[in-house]
Amino acid sequence: MARKKSSGLKITLIVLLAIVTIIAIALVAILPTKTPAVELVSTIPGKCPSAENDRLDEKINCIPDQFPTQALCAMQGCCWNPRNESPTPWCSFANNHGYEFEKISNPNINFEPNLKKNSPPTLFGDNITNLLLTTQSQTANRFRFKITDPNNQRYEVPHQFVNKDFSGPPASNPLYDVKITENPFSIKVIRKSNNKILFDTSIGPLVYSNQYLQISTKLPSKYIYGLGEHVHKRFRHDLYWKTWPIFTRDQLPGDNNNNLYGHQTFFMSIEDTSGKSFGVFLMNSNAMEVFIQPTPIVTYRVIGGILDFYIFLGDTPGQVVQQYQELTGRPAMPSYWSLGFQLSRWNYGSLDAVKEVVKRNRDARIPFDAQVTDIDYMEDKKDFTYNNKTFYGLPEFVKDLHDHGQKYIIILDPAISITSLANGNHYKTYERGNEQKVWVYQSDGTTPLIGEVWPGLTVYPDFTNPKCLDWWTNECSIFHEEIKYDGLWIDMNEVSSFVHGSTKGCSDNKLNYPPFIPDILDKLMYAKTICMDAIQHWGKQYDVHSLYGYSMAIATEKAIEKVFPNKRSFILTRSTFAGTGKHATHWLGDNTPSWEHMEWSITPMLEFGLFGMPFIGADICGFVVDTTEELCRRWMQIGAFYPYFRDHNAGGYMPQDPAYFGQDSLLVNTSRHYLDIWYTLLPYLYNLLYKAYVYGETVARPFLYEFYEDTNSWIEDLQFLWGSALLITPVLRQGADRMSAYIPDATWYDYETGGKRTWRKQRVEMYLPGDKIGLHVRGGYIIPTQQPAVNTTASRKNPLGLIIALDNNAAKGDFFWDDGESKDSIEKGKYILYTFSVLNNELDIICTHSSYQEGTTLAFETIKILGLANTVTQVQVAENNQQTIIHNSFTYHASNQSLIIDNLKLNLGKNFTVQWNQVSLDSEKIDCFPDNNPENKQNCEERGCLWEPNSAAEGPRCYFPKQYNPYLVKSTQYSSMGITVDLELNTATARIKMPSNPISVLRLEVKYHKNDMLQFKIYDPQNKRYEVPIPMDIPTTPTSTYENRLYDVNIKGNPFGIQIRRRSTGRIFWDSCLPWGLLLMNQFIQISTRLPSEYVYGFGGVGHRQFKQDLNWHKWGMFNRDQPSGYKISSYGFQPYIYMALGDGGNAHGVFLLNSNAMDVTFQPNPALTYRTIGGILDFYMFLGPNPEVATKQYHEVIGRPVKPPYWALGFHLCRYGYENTSEIRQLYEDMVSAQIPYDVQYTDIDYMERQLDFTIGKGFQDLPEFVDKIRDEGMKYIIILDPAISGNETQDYLAFQRGIEKDVFVKWPNTQDICWAKVWPDLPNITIDDSLTEDEAVNASRAHVAFPDFLKTSTAEWWATEIEDFYNTYMKFDGLWIDMNEPSSFVHGSVDNKCRNEILNYPPYMPALTKRNEGLHFRTMCMETQQTLSNGSSVLHYDVHNLYGWSQAKPTYDALQKTTGKRGIVISRSTYPSAGRWAGHWLGDNYANWDKIGKSIIGMMEFSLFGISFTGADICGFFNNSDYELCARWMQVGAFYPYSRNHNITDTRRQDPVSWNETFASMSTDILNIRYNLLPYFYTQMHDIHANGGTVIRPLLHEFFSETGTWDIYKQFLWGPAFMVTPVVEPYSESVTGYVPDGRWLDYHTGQDIGLRKRLHTLDAPLYKINLHVCGGHILPCQEPAQNTYFSRQNYMKLIVAADDNQTAQGYLFWDDGESIDTYEKGQYLLVQFNLNKATLTSTILKNGYINTREMRLGFINVWGKGNTVVQEVNITYKGNKESVKFSQEANKQILNIDLTANNIVLDEPIEISWT
């Protein structure tokens, strides 16, 4: 039944409907005049489409205002096709609706045919039967058509700039043609060049009635931008059946389609990747809605006026926008000061509150230019008044702003109160307006319309009335006489009313209730505004409503012209219309503090750029509701790149000006940072705004304007550009420190580092921590800059600069400068204009216009050039083509390839040329002849390298040619967890002949183990090579995620290289893209990398002169040898770990090469580093930090965190090599006790043994076991020495050797059962040593053959444990073991006959730079070909594992010690390798009693802290040579703060123990060791922390103060943890010491007083018996009263040193266990307490309570230092719920409070609270 009716309807429609015309430009219709013709096409009247031809996505809704029914659809003469769950219209137009075109003869693009209405029913009544179509070819790029009623004048927008009566001749050669279809009428606009239809109304009918106009157009592209004002969320329009109402409304933005403040009917569309684009503008101010559907089709539904369309064609999107602005008016040129940061708030409440905001932001050095006040400054919110009570003194405040170079902006609302002033006086503003009849009137035209806004009952100025303009101008002028404001903010001008329509309501008529109401908010025309039948000079409110803000902006501009003659000033408006930007700027209204609103601010910023309002921004941090610190911080970052930059929020919510968050808060710091960048870039922004004013260019720019050839750029709207050259990537997600960012197809440089990014035309994950925003400069552009200041008044006086970002060695830019405020400076030519260009290392600075004389005092003083691949050694400058002059003030940074030229004086108004060279320096050359063979030209050239004898003495004379690289990339495979790259030998490099033949095929594996750690290894995939058999603690499966990684890895193909970049800064920290950056041979491996910084630390086992590495061509060999440490001498340890601190905020990373073969590393100054090793593979681990201490912790996590020593081991240790008997030791012990010198541990060296045989006791020491038992009973501990070498020449049973033979534990010759015999300390039995023999003769005559245990074997560990346990149980007790000579050391070379059996292993083709380099690797150790056995049973050459010998001995020794004693114990090892610190401490070897060794010991301690061996120290007073009194005294002072504090020296030198000098020395020793013992709980807590978490105890200053570059070179001071600084004297005859005082509060340990120094070097008083010690404010140190040893001190009262910081806060921790049990932390058998000071309250919090010996945890004393000047009257403690008063004393003048708790019985395992008043 339904189907039958539908069929009948279709037949009826065929008969009744008439078909209208379609317009399009025909390419073939060209008249001889080159003016395109209009092609007319006749069509046959149609009907509803058949089912097969029914395009659902092309249906145009016939019933847009209500839910359709079939009956209603039939009544409208439309087509019914309901579809469930479909957004397509159920009722759509048939193709016989619309108008019929009246034919004309000889049409062209400028013509005026008539249109006649077809017969179908009207939609909303009052159809207009006859219409007039007017078309105009206005320019080659702009086509206009309008449709009007020829019989009745309809409302047309009285725009102040657009000429509605265009009368010019048709454009010749336009880019478009037009095609018209006659019936039904339609029009098409076609691009000539490609026949693409841009605008096609044939998709739907023209509807034209008195109060309803509809037209649809089909578009060629789905990429549409514009229309407003709404929250579109995305810049590219969502085409999925969206309705956007346009009608100005006081409505805050939200997640909806509400119509907002502005009326903007322009949109733009990009057509294809050629950039061709078009725009459409409807000049109509009536309420409307624009409906967009997916085809895409755009339908306009307008309720008044006319249809007046402008179509713009451009070759690029930017051209289209320029053409639109050419029509509607280009934006105003803002005053320079208005570009500065503005602070504002609604409802400060009082002037005092405003003053406080200004003060705190000035104090925080927040640059800002203008203070804004909202309506709360007014009296009762009345315009042109101010509140004499709450804002008393406002004129004086404004003067203060002006005196500080700042401006004052006031708000003015349009609504004028009709009530008197508060004092009863007349409100003159209202009275004068009444007299001049300037108000909006009711429909009678005579009665002012009364509404209600902020002041209460109000009238509304009619700004379209010329009289009103005069009145408004006069009021602004009068008020300026009273308050010297500088700019005006006009608000509420949509126009807004708090009552609907008026206080009387609105009449029931078709203006207030039209037949069709667009989808506006509330669906009521006069909701929150005035009645639509109200009368204005330009017409009825129905027509002109959306022009209210526009007309007010024009009126305000006129007022400004009077108030500030010839000045630009500043006008900010909320409501806008097309062309408003010519008169005012705009902000995005009353937003919400939410992450969504911050994100959504980017799209309208870009949209208003289209609309001709580029000076645009949002309320930073949000307007309504409380913001959050994180949101506000991120918003300040993005806001710094809004063209208009204002922080504004509503009353009743928290303040959100930057300084409110704290003077040193992260928000303030990042805000200041980016404000400084903002002010630095203001010349660039001003230049962009100049080009917007002159040419109509955009400022904040979407990617598609610049990169239209890349379709990815068409949808990007979470990033934006400033002009062409600056890319901004904000963080828009809560809690995020990474943003998925698209990097357009260009060269990009990190703005802050200058480093070149490798990204291009790709999506990347950009790491942006809490204080960072992504900011990148585009290659090929030059950006003008100026040194920032606190405001533009100051900054405009500062020197100018240029940032030149090169692309293919070229760049361009321009610069505009005027006085920043004159109204017509451009029109009058009073400005300076420059163009810049760079080509081939030459910058031309060309002044094209100079008529601003005052500006010529400014000069370009700094030029920064990014992207210079080679070093610059010369810069020349020339003025006005004169002779060039050498300019010497410049710096080239190789790490980021940038050049900074400073101290220039290139004054404005002149032309200049700046030239620079690019050369390859000696410092960049890679040594081609590192081996020990004679280096000369012949040998060099035979190798295939380049010879340059005139190179610097330090640099290589023989070096690799740049164009060669041994390996090429064959294939690359990427995965989410890493990269695998296969490399093949580059045959083109065959002429380079290195020590052996390269391996032809290599494989690189990169593994992204963690977000802050990665590994890459390079090996031979075809032949198994030796790899270090040490397990690393790394995830079985990588745990990193792409989004969260701190690094990016880039594989370069030619030359092959690995680049690793820190995401947060863009800095490349590993870059092996160097000539011969990789070479891998069987016995020679080389890899080179550029370094990002000259601040490099680490590489152990070699003596360094300072902590920071010297990069001036220094080579450091690493190979374990029994060799006392000395400069460049390879010594006991092998530690291939370094970290680098970068010059960008203290970022640091660590690099660890897991390789145990002999190697050397070479630093060179460019800076770069080359590793050369003679075996194994390359296996690198990188740790990203980001600061030095964190990078170190990450390294320790991989190799194993440091061992936790027993508490007693932190006491003082005494030892000597050369004790003759037990009596000598006993006497020493008694003397130490008698002198009350604290000490815990006594040693004996090998002299306690029989003939230096392990596990024996010599004749003079038979009573040693009893002595040891005695002192252990008195709280002491004993440590014995064990050497690895086991004698094999014994005539009596020697069980250690015999059981070793049985267990097969000794190192052998390869493929035999023969032991490789050596000689060390053990003597032959029954031999008398002849003292007249030389050392070598004595070794041959008296030393026994010894065998070295192979500690890599499992059986050896078992044998070793048996020997240790047997000696402990059978002979004597001990508490710790000292393992020495374990490099391993031998007194013969290789074997007892000084011969080895494999030449190439002991004398490899490349011999690293080792001590005795020519003597072979076997010098004073085993032969390299000897064979050892791994735990898995496989054999390995000593050649590969030599450096693991001491490491392999450490764990078996530690395990045996703990098994034997049942206690934690301590092992001290001389030889080390990475991870040895898990089981052993280390001393720095056999040093000399020289002054320089004291300083070297600090370097060694700090280095071994990096290496994960924190329990370390040097032999106090020196091992070799006689010490002297002053040297030993100073060494005792610094040694008291070694983690491992031991006095030790060699036989046949004078005694140097503390009691061996005199009583004064002994007393000094007591005093300094008492300080140590007092601090042991703090020290022990630090040792626990690194055991649990990794890190350092002995800490370089830069680890705590990494952002302070002054700490980066310090190596004669150190920290204990974060809080305790030691500044010793390390020079002879000195009674003062110069130390660095980092930025913080420091309190003298000896006096408790603030030293009042920060961030500077200072000379401190240091007489002989004083060492300078300081505590860092903000920390709490747990202490304990000292005693003779730790057994007794642990029973004394605890105390706290509370060192307050500047804010009277501090924090600290105490870890406490029994001090000796095994794995107390792992078993939870400990106490962990956190202490906090907050002002005058000290609290403790129990974090873990697993230790029960309360006797050791009694809190007796608290010393509060730096407490403030307030005199304390009372101290109370709350403990176990009880509050008590406590005893105290104070030194008020020193800010010291001493609290005595001994009477209160306080135990730390319960929380406490202590407060004082």
Curated annotation (Swiss-Prot):
**Can the keyword Cell membrane be found in this entry's annotation?**
yes
Q: Consult the record and explain the modifications the protein receives after translation.
A: The precursor is proteolytically cleaved when exposed to pancreatic proteases in the intestinal lumen.
| Parts of the chain that traverse the membrane | 13-32
InterPro entries cross-referenced by the UniProt entry: Gal_mutarotase_sf_dom (IPR011013), Glyco_hydro_31_AS (IPR030458), Glyco_hydro_31_C (IPR048395), Glyco_hydro_31_CS (IPR030459), Glyco_hydro_31_N_dom (IPR025887), Glyco_hydro_31_TIM (IPR000322), Glyco_hydro_b (IPR013780), Glycoside_hydrolase_SF (IPR017853)
Sample GO molecular function, one term: alpha-1,4-glucosidase activity
One GO cellular component this record assigns the protein to is: apical plasma membrane
Domain P-type as annotated: residue spans: 46-95, 917-962
User: Which sequence positions carry the modification called Sulfotyrosine?
Assistant: 377, 1294, 1368, 1371
Q: Which residues lie on this side of the membrane: Cytoplasmic?
A: 1-12
BP-aspect Gene Ontology terms: carbohydrate metabolic process
Tell me the protein's name: Sucrase-isomaltase, intestinal
